[in-house]
Amino acid sequence: MLKFTKITLSALALITASLGAANAAVTVLGWPGGSEETALRAVAEAYNAQSGVADADKVELLFYSRDGFYDKLQADMAAGSSAFDINLLATYSIGRYASYMEPVDLGPDAAKVFGESVLKTMQFDGKQYGVPTDLSLHFMYYRKDLIDALLADPAAKTKYAEISEKYFGKPLEPKAPDSWTWDDWAATALYFAKSVNPESPVRYGTVLQMKNLLFNIMVWQSVARANGGDWMDASGNITIDSPAYRTALELYKKLYDAGASPKDSLSYEYAETNAAFGSGQVATALQWNAAAGELTDPAKSPAVAENVGIVAPPAGSAGRADHIHGLGLGINKNAKNKPGAAKFLQWLATEDAALLYARSGGSPALLPDVAAKIAKERPDLVTLGQYAGAYGYVMTGATSANAFPVYELQAKEFTGYWSGQETLDEALANTKAGMEKLLKP
């Protein structure tokens, strides 16, 4: 049976001893929680069950908290830890960890499964450092039944116009979600908030991920990007204090202060967002694509699954934008079982393994002919490829060695603004000053 453990940084030093006789096994430090963990468990179980896998090469999984994950990982790898053979890596952090990792040959079939462009998300300086397991971007999830009822009700449209005029200074008409601007989405969220509209059939219009966590900034920042926002200009000047960023930050605060999102949203991230939307009391949610499998599964989200609609994030003055990055698994340079680790990653890059990973809730970016084999079960993976190609972006400077500290800085300052601990001017000034230090040439 597959073993897995949740660990903290202090516990990593004890892993070698705690594994005992299993020291020869392939230990995998994965991404904790969510569909990525679920899918990794499934493929590891399947791999271990194969008759051709020696006991010394069977996989064991390790997990620790998302908070500070990459800093902990870097500290471990820089210290020469051999507590894990395989570790998580991401497009935006490969350069940070490449010197601590071993390039891997995934075999000739990997390109037939993922395609060269996806394989490149796990490459650095022309070398392959991992197998791409998940492509991450964001979907706008919404309740089809609620939106359909709004669009069909003249009285509801009148109420919607009144609410939008109060909050945006202009009356807006309800639209189909695929035609939403960010103002349209916000007006819809306000309409479905009982604090704003006591006649709303649900309690909240949306659920915002506002915890002081860098990944929440990745979700939010598409509002700024859609309005032309970026971290830096072509000359390397920090451009964070811009109308695009101000508009995006103010929009979230407006919704939060109005009660369109739960008051404890300041502690929300991925799991809390899924739970809130899945409860049936939320009309919309900007959430990672990985949530699609759970939110559209009647067994996991019975209150909403049959009525979940999915579109790309709304448009701003510069069009639509969707943050994108890849997650994968690579080999620790100090791994105790490099041959066993390479075998597991090579297997993970096969079509059968990729399809199992997808069926188990993961979100691999697959070539069309491979994705077609799972389109009925996972239509979101087809959508994933479409949105990535049309709206995907990476902020200028967001693949640098200090990308994570920048995201952490933004999370701290922007959450401070949303929670009322500092003004918008203070938050942007502090962020700009910090980014100028972190991203200086």
Please place each PLM-identified region on the residue numbering.
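Long, aromatic- and glycine/proline-rich binding clefts that accommodate carbohydrate-like moieties
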Residues: 122, 306-312, 358-416, 441
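Extracytoplasmic/periplasmic substrate-binding proteins
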Residues: 30-31, 48, 94, 217-227, ...
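Helix-loop-helix "hinge/cap" segment bordering the ligand-binding cleft or interdomain interface
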Residues: 49, 55, 124-215, 229-265, ...
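Extracytoplasmic "Venus flytrap"
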Residues: 26-43, 64-67, 136, 211-214, ...
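Extracytoplasmic "Venus flytrap"/periplasmic binding protein-like
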Residues: 26-27, 46, 51-117, 121-123, ...
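Short, polar/charged alpha-helical segment
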Residues: 34-58, 141, 410, 428
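Extracytoplasmic/periplasmic substrate-recognition and gating elements
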Residues: 55, 126-128, 146, 257-260, ...
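Hinge/lid segment of periplasmic solute-binding proteins
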Residues: 89-141, 145-154, 183, 216, ...
